[in-house]
């Protein structure tokens, strides 16, 4: 007798690996001809931009955008120059080769600039990269069987799966007014994109978002001014089919950008061109029905059962906190600008099904003293947050700093988001193979068996032992459900 098993293959994705690495780059560079000769470096800040990710080779390539603020004896006011320091990192984790998409969370452990001469600089940067590798997995479950006299034991299970990951990039260009402020030069700038909505329309994914822009400018009278602006962006991603009833989450990071002044008769404008990385994650709940055991009333069968490991994942949980700092001055007004900030790495403590997270936020603030000379100060604040559950992966994100000046005080607030991603492993015991066993000396079987259920025995095990069926035992004993009586049980033996 031939027994045919039917299998269902479920395609999903999972976090296959997590790797971290640090890398040091040093370089020497000359100031461009249009820059004034430097006499003293006031501040050096860096932004890490990942341009290329190659999972098959385990390579991460990008640049550190180093912006240097300095003073010059040749001219008044604060000067700046931006230098791109390329880097490449090779990760040795072999599981990265199995990944289809890499998500990189980066920070700079060190960014420093020193003067060799008035026109030559020494730069040193140490980026830290935390790489999450997402790869494809196939779940193979036995969902049916055909054969004479087969009795099937089935089970239903609700699964939360990461059903799709996809990475794309897009370009955007925007212009906006900054008013008649006599802007002369952009000294520092930073952009942070964020997605506000996403919608699946056929095979297209429509994404809308905003780009937060922060810039430090020098005006024509050599004063400093901070500019904060938000501009919209939208993108249609073609060829992306999100599984039905999925929850979509889109993460975005800047790949490169250029912010420039556009001078005209009506005032001053800024123009932004940027290239943005978009990473699409789709989560969905799916019910699966699979066979955990089977037997035949016509013959003796040997059943093989395997454990299929499923990692159930939902959308990352996000909790936002604020890192706050207060600057005070004896003057009536205080100008300040955050040149760089770092959230560090999250420390996780799990207790009673809840994770307590903490991080130290470090910020460098540029302000003007009582003589209106530019100076910098470093501050740090520890922040804490709580997340339900015990996430296996935690990372940090932040928005642009908010500054509020009033009566000789300046309050600095930096929004910090704690992200927690929890993967719960579930083992599904499912039939993977069956084999008919030939009995050398088959013994005659009775037509009915009368016995008392053993402690802990279930209806399925009794039916399987005596080549019966659960339904036949229920009918013979007038049972409404699978609850076994305390007394004797009539077990009809089904014969081919």
Predicted features and spans:
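Primarily a LysM-type cell-wall glycan-binding module
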Residues: 438-475, 480-496
């Amino acid at each position: 007798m031939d027994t045919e098993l039917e299998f269902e293959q479920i395609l999903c994705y999972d976090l296959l690996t997590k790797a971290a690495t640090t890398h040091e780059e040093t370089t020497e560079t000359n100031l461009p001809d249009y820059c004034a000769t430097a006499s003293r470096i006031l501040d050096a800040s860096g932004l890490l931009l990942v341009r290329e990710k190659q999972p098959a080779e385990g390579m991460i390539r990008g640049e550190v955008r180093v912006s240097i603020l300095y003073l010059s004896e040749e001219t008044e006011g604060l000067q700046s120059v931006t230098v791109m320091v390329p880097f490449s990192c090779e990760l040795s984790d072999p599981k990265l080769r199995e990944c289809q998409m890499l998500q990189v969370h980066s920070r700079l452990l060190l960014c420093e600039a020193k003067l060799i001469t008035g026109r030559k600089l020494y730069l040193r940067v140490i980026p830290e990269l935390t790489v999450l590798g997402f790869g494809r997995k196939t779940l193979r479950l036995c969902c049916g069987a055909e054969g004479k006299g087969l009795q099937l034991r089935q089970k239903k299970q609700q699964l939360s799966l990461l059903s799709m990951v996809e990475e794309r990039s897009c370009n955007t260009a925007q212009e906006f007014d900054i008013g008649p402020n006599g802007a002369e030069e952009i000294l520092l700038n930073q952009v942070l994109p964020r997605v506000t909505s996403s919608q699946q329309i056929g095979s297209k994914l429509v994404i809308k978002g905003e780009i937060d822009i922060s810039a430090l400018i020098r005006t024509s009278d050599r004063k400093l001014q901070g500019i904060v602006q938000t501009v919209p962006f939208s993108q249609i991603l073609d060829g992306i089919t999100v599984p039905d009833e999925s929850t979509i989450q889109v993460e975005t990071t800047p790949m490169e950008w250029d912010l420039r002044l556009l001078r005209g008769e009506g005032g001053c404008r800024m123009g932004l061109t940027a290239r943005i990385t978009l990473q699409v994650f789709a989560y969905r709940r799916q019910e699966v029905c699979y066979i955990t055991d089977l037997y035949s009333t016509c013959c003796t069968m040997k059943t093989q059962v395997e454990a299929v490991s499923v990692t159930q994942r939902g959308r990352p949980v996000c909790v936002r906190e604020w890192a706050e700092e207060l600057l005070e001055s004896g003057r009536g007004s205080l100008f300040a600008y955050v040149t760089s900030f770092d959230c560090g790495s999250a420390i996780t403590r799990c207790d009673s099904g809840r994770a307590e997270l903490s991080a130290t936020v470090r910020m460098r603030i540029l302000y003007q003293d009582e003589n209106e000379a530019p100076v910098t100060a470093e501050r740090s604040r520890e922040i804490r947050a709580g997340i339900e559950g015990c996430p296996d992966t935690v990372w940090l994100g932040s928005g642009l700093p908010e500054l509020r000046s009033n009566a000789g005080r300046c309050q600095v607030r930096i929004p910090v988001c704690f992200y927690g991603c929890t993967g719960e492993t579930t083992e599904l015991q499912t039939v993977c193979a069956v084999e008919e066993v030939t009995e050398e000396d088959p013994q005659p079987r009775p037509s009915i068996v009368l016995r008392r259920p053993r402690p802990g025995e279930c209806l399925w095990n009794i039916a399987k032992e005596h080549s019966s069926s659960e339904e036949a035992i229920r009918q013979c004993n007038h049972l409404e459900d699978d609850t076994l009586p305390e007394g004797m049980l009539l077990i009809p033996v089904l014969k081919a």
